[in-house]
């Protein structure tokens, strides 16, 4: 098979090259400029996929990955550890620009990107899977999502959580039975949390023992238990009721920068009616209320809404899916929306198009669903696009788009 020069990176992180017949071929674990010999070619009508067989000529953009799991091609959590940081950032800028041009049909350049202060050791949450036979707890393989490998250390997660994981690994016999998943999380105050997700069954009675063993190893953490279909319960370690399952940014420092930029882009809010959609635990809602806005806040996770209410300040908070709550909201002057990776429901886009607020600030963690939603908002023009590097070593990127009502 002929050698292939990798031209650029695709949105999922795979390298893109060309076959002799002109078809595009996607090759994971390659960098722009690599000359590679592909293996396991699988052809389709318009494109092909292959594995990296041999690296014939490494690109100047290629670096040695830090993570042994990545080197062994085990882990699917990172896609770009083999690519130098500047080239990663350039690729993520391109992912956003390409999606907006190709999918949303918007005439925009690749946006500027605000770099992260840390390229590694930044995630304050990691979700671990359990193998079908219950013997392995770790992450999914990058090429086999149905397989789980035992995690030793994740290099994009904060060391405080990985040190906790080293202690937990040695205490596996004390984990609850019928385990389905484990979440490690560090709060802003520095406290560590472990959430054990299990199949339905009797209440976990071993939390106190595991907590004592962790303390003996200087690895204290609040332990939570959540049976399938049930609410999480704090079982040992702290009295606070703060739910370990509500959404928070996994890269808090960069998340704060995203929020600050989004609020600034919204403009003056004193005396204005503002919708905060997909509001999470209400940090944006609180900032808007403190600035004098009349805020309508919507969040589907009732635990997050309760946490937001406990933090204040006053706002009209609605617990429910945005598309179901719209009819209860008063027409907005301004809107900020921060949906999950799946983007906004079509009914939400249709309502925003009909109501036509003066300005809409869209915070997105997926360029493709962002572009889809912008395609449903033709009466708004793009005033600004800015990307934020919340997820170094991966193909993911956060984007803030400022939309203004076209006159």
Please give the residue ranges for each predicted region.
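A short glycine-rich, hydrophobically flanked beta-strand micro-motif that places a catalytic Asp/Glu
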Residues: 111, 177-186, 221-224
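Terminal RNA-binding accessory module
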Residues: 1-72, 86, 144
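Rossmann-like S-adenosyl-L-methionine
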Residues: 5, 11, 174, 201-407
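A short, glycine/Asx- and small/polar-enriched loop/turn
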Residues: 120-124, 190, 395-396
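Short, solvent-exposed loop/turn elements at beta->coil junctions and helix N-caps
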Residues: 112-119, 182-185, 229-230, 386-390
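Extended interfacial segments that mediate partner engagement and assembly in macromolecular machines
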Residues: 53-68, 72-179
């Amino acid at each position: 098979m002929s050698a292939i020069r990798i031209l650029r990176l695709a949105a999922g992180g795979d390298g893109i090259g060309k076959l002799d017949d002109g078809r595009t071929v996607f090759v994971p674990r390659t960098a722009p400029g690599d000359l590679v010999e592909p293996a396991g070619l699988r052809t389709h009508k318009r494109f092909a996929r292959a594995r990296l067989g041999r690296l014939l000529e490494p690109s100047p953009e290629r670096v040695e990955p830090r993570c042994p799991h990545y080197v062994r091609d085990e882990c699917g959590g990172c896609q770009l550890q083999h690519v130098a940081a500047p080239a990663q950032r350039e690729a993520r800028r391109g992912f956003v620009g390409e999606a907006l041009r190709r999918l949303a049909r918007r005439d925009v350049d690749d946006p500027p990107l605000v770099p992260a202060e840390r390229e590694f050791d930044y995630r304050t949450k990691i979700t671990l899977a359990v193998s079908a036979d219950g013997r392995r707890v770790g992450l999914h393989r990058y090429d086999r999502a149905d397989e789980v490998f035992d995690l030793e250390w994740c290099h994009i997660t904060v060391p405080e959580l990985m040190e906790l994981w080293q202690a937990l690994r040695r205490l596996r016999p004390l984990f609850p039975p019928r385990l389905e998943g484990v979440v490690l999380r560090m709060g802003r105050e520095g406290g560590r949390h472990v959430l054990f997700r299990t199949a339905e069954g009797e209440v976990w009675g071993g939390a106190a023992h595991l907590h004592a063993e962790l303390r003996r190893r200087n690895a204290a953490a609040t332990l939570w238990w959540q049976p399938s279909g049930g609410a999480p319960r704090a079982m040992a370690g702290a009295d606070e009721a703060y739910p370990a399952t509500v959404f928070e940014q996994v890269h808090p420092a960069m998340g704060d920068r995203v929020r600050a930029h989004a609020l600034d882009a919204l403009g003056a809010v004193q005396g204005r009616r503002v919708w905060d959609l997909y509001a999470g635990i209400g940090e944006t809602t609180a900032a808007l209320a403190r600035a004098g806005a009349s805020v309508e806040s919507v969040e589907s996770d009732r635990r997050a809404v309760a946490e937001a209410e406990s933090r204040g300040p006053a706002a009209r908070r609605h617990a429910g899916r945005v598309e179901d709550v719209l009819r209860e909201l008063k027409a907005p002057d301004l809107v900020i929306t921060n949906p999950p990776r799946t983007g906004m429901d079509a009914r939400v886009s249709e309502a925003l198009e009909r109501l036509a607020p003066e300005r809409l600030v869209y915070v997105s963690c997926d360029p493709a669903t962002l572009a889809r939603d912008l395609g449903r908002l033709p009466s708004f023009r793009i005033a600004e696009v800015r990307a934020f590097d919340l997820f170094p070593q991966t193909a993911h990127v956060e984007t803030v788009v400022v939309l203004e009502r076209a006159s």
